[in-house]
């Protein structure tokens, strides 16, 4: 939402857009400190005041936490514990590329946190990853991997994202590791847009049973929310 500093809708505007797209649930995941202009950690201390249902759309509260060098998270545990779920991802604005092995090790270290349920956009060869290691870690630590529609829209910025997703999806299918497919909407007009991601899944024959957010109960069970 607006709170992240480079997005352009409020929570209620995002929920209204989700209703228009006939979505049952939306996750609001502001960027954690480390991204310019985003929220202070104190923001996560008062999430309870936000209605759990807006315009008939269920609201879950997450955070996209930055992977830092040394395998550290960019948000303190006391704030992470207030979330419904945490996402971890590498962002070049607050991370120095350590090569395939180092990047993968740092990401996996963050995935060990029990509140972490998702890895965001693991697709960009500007910070390359070892996909066999990543998928095996996702299986071990019960973390799902994201197929990010916005990455495919801006594929000129996400180096080799299509091929990286094909590699990742083949491994997820092999080892039965779940994924989420999402818009990564930073404006209400993008909420629910998953066209390129869904086309990619169809092109590789990906098993829909491994797509967590194809089924509301399956998604909520995985996230551990009621």
Feature locations, PLM:
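Catalytic domains of carbohydrate-active enzymes, especially glycoside hydrolases
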Residues: 14-26
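Conserved short secondary-structure transition element at the edge of the structured enzyme core
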Residues: 165-183
């Amino acid at each position: 939402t607006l709170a992240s500093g480079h997005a352009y809708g409020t929570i209620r505007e995002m929920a209204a857009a989700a209703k228009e797209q006939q979505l049952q649930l939306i996750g609001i995941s502001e960027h954690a400190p480390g991204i310019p202009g985003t929220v202070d950690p104190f923001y996560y201390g008062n999430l309870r005041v936000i209605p759990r249902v807006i315009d008939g759309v269920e609201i879950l509260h997450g955070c996209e936490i930055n992977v830092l060098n040394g395998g550290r998270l960019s948000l303190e545990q006391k704030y992470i514990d207030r979330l419904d779920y945490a996402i971890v991802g590498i962002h070049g604005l607050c991370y120095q590329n350590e090569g395939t092995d180092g990047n993968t090790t740092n990401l996996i270290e963050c995935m060990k946190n029990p509140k972490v349920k998702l890895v965001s956009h693991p697709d960009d060869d500007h910070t390359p990853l070892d996909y066999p290691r990543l998928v095996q870690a996702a299986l071990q630590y019960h973390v799902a991997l994201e197929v990010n529609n916005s990455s495919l829209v801006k594929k000129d910025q996400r180096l080799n994202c299509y091929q990286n997703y094909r590699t990742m999806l083949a491994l997820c299918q092999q080892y039965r590791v779940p994924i989420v497919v999402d818009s990564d909407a930073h404006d209400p007009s993008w909420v629910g847009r998953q066209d390129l991601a869904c086309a990619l899944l169809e092109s590789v024959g990906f098993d829909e049973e491994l797509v967590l957010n194809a089924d509301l109960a399956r998604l909520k069970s995985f996230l551990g929310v009621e």
